């Protein structure tokens, strides 16, 4: 054990619980900062925007130290600035070595943050590949743009 590893042993169970609580609070603060919400840390969740609430949910998911984060339509209802903030958070999550699975209709976001994309049309897989491959795929163009114009 290192110097701080047994500090809770000297104070008994209550000291250990306090040390763990302090660690959890510090981790929560770090994750709130990580998703860009440091300025609203003390606000009630009912007073922050829906985009900020989604970022807070991402921070909450990250608190469990997962290997995979699943984001189901995280950009729904977001304006361009909020989508850009979300894209930056997703990129930083990936830089931490976490896998991110995004289900999303906003193709700009998908093209920006994903290395590999699977495209579904009415529940059927019609394409899979890198963003640049998906953008040129005739089945994707037909399904989502109604053909080449």
Language-model region placement:
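Glycine-rich phosphate-binding loops of nucleotide-dependent enzymes
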Residues: 1-149
């Amino acid at each position: 054990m290192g110097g701080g590893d047994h500090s809770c042993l000297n104070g008994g169970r209550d000291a250990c619980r306090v040390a763990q609580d302090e660690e959890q609070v510090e981790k929560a603060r770090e994750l709130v900062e990580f998703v860009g919400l440091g300025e609203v840390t003390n606000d009630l969740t009912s007073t922050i925007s829906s985009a900020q609430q989604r970022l807070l949910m991402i921070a909450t998911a990250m608190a469990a130290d997962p290997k995979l984060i699943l984001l189901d339509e995280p950009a729904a209802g977001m304006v361009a600035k909020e989508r850009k903030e979300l894209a930056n958070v997703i990129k930083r999550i990936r830089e931490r070595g976490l896998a991110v699975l995004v289900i999303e209709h906003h193709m700009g976001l998908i093209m920006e943050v994903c290395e590999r994309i699977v495209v579904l049309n009415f529940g059927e897989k019609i394409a899979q590949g890198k963003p640049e491959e998906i953008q040129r795929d005739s089945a994707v163009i037909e399904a989502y743009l109604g053909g080449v114009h």
